[in-house]
Amino acid sequence: MKIAHIHWSLGTGGIETMLPDIVSEQAKTNEVALIIVNDWVEKSILAKVDKRVKVVLLNRHAGSKNPWPIIKLNLFLMRFRPDIVHAHAYDEIKLVVYPFGKRVRTIHNTNNLVSPKEFPKFDKLISISKAVQDETMGQGFRNIKIDNGIPVARILYSKNIPFSDGKLHFIQVSRLDVEQKGQDILIKALDLVKHKFGFDNFVMHFVGRGNDEAMLKQMVHELNLDQEIVFEGLKDQTWVYENLCNFDLFIQPSRYEGFGLTVAEAIAAKVPVLVSNIEGPLEIIDGGRLGLSFENKDATDCANKIVDFIKQGRKEAQVEEAYQYVCDHYDVSVTARKYLEVYQSILK
């Protein structure tokens, strides 16, 4: 089977970090191409792609009207002649003139207001979580659920460089984008933890970059949390997979989230997690059985749950059960295999 995956960029977001793992798994038994349209390509992510995958970098400038990258895309497709063209974001399929093969779209997030306009163009729609599936069904489009996957075996789970300052170290790994990722909620919660509840024996590490970085840093300064909150900047996936295990608590305060790859990664590193009680992350912790959750957008409830963790510490049995749950349900090999089964079903 010949499979062509198309995506706008190869940065450090959840889709981009997962795609190399998916195509590399599929390339073990199939001919696979990965086509990146725009010129935003993170070299450390690209380096993860298996050598058997045909990588096509079109190097289009975002928003460019130059037709040449689109012509190159379709010339490649005509030569490669894929059985499956698999798109991962809105408007990608509009670039494809190639008339053959079946078209598949993975829906990677909730709050999809524009994407449904193009859903009828696909032979199969795939949602990454029950939350995304339910939303898409509610919009009138049949779809199946295939959970996102992570390379569990590559994630270390034994502390290798533990912190030696006697403090609890919390972490969030994501784009600095308060509208979706909710870092402002977490900062307000940590303000309460320190100034209302009187706990200051912690350090919060934000890993990532984004448009809201300056605003968040100003917020931290105004709340007198400069000693408790550190902005680590962008770290590559290797750093994340090797260092997550050294932290005491992973916190994901997203306002909305289709899935939450970094939540699964933290669990694979055997780190306790605290997430907002939205459906994507909540699904990963089995409705709250395998981790902590707080009321979405509620900084006070988030603070209360952090204080509970500070007082009670990690629950080893829960951490181990969560780890096994992620191994069984969210390993990337399972995701890649299920995609192949879908391709085969629509090619019959």
Give, region by region, the residue ranges found by the protein language model.
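N-terminal strand-loop element at the rim of the active site
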Residues: 5-68, 76, 210-212
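A conserved mid-protein helix/loop that constitutes part of the nucleotide-sugar donor-binding site
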Residues: 16-21, 168, 177-195, 211-217
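Active-site donor-binding acidic/aromatic loop of nucleotide-activated sugar
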Residues: 212-215, 225-236, 243, 292-293
